[in-house]
Amino acid sequence: VTVEDHQSTPTHIELQPPVTIKSYVRRGEPFESTYTAVPERVVAMWQNSIETIIALGEGDRIVAGMGIPNRKYVRSEYREAYDKIPYKDMKYANLESVLMMKPDLLVGWRSTFTNKGLRTPAFWQARNANVYIAESSLGAQSALTMDMEYQYIRDLGRIFNRNMEAEKLIHDMEQSVA
């Protein structure tokens, strides 16, 4: 698997000041990632990550989207952007393939980042790639809250310098559940 021929090269955008985001590893221990620029080569796992990045207007930065069995499951307003993602599959690509994609950000759930999966955040940080793990993927379903989802969207908004878009998504979600 290679995405070297990925046609669109996203614009380089520096973050001033740099953005530091707290995320969590498998057992819920926090770790921090600092972003000095908006990520340009994103590997996104699972539908929520892919759709949120697209909703923020940053779908052209996704070089691989994994975890969606068929495009029909993608919200209709996001399908055009989803179709442009160079590598799409229900299953994770193997580690070697992901390394060849040269990501600078990987977004997924805690189950993604294990020694048996796509390795730990420390593995990726040693290769100049940040990792963002959704807090909602850490615990039991009964512990999930909308605030966790809103924080997830806010964090991605900060990472991609799309704070206004993130707040609009959150506002729309709040209106739909009110």
Show which residues each predicted segment covers:
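Bacterial Sec-exported substrate-binding components of ABC uptake systems
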Residues: 1-51, 163-178
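Short, conserved catalytic or adaptor-binding loops enriched in Gly and charged residues
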Residues: 11-13, 77-82, 123-125
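Extracellular/periplasmic catalytic domains that process cell-envelope and extracellular macromolecules
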Residues: 13, 35-37, 57, 99-100, ...
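Active-site-adjacent structural elements in enzyme catalytic domains
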Residues: 40, 47, 100-105, 115-126, ...
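A short, structured surface patch at a secondary-structure boundary
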Residues: 41-101, 105, 109-111
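Extracytoplasmic/secreted cell-surface and envelope-processing proteins
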Residues: 73-74, 114-118, 142
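Extracytoplasmic substrate-binding proteins
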Residues: 120-178
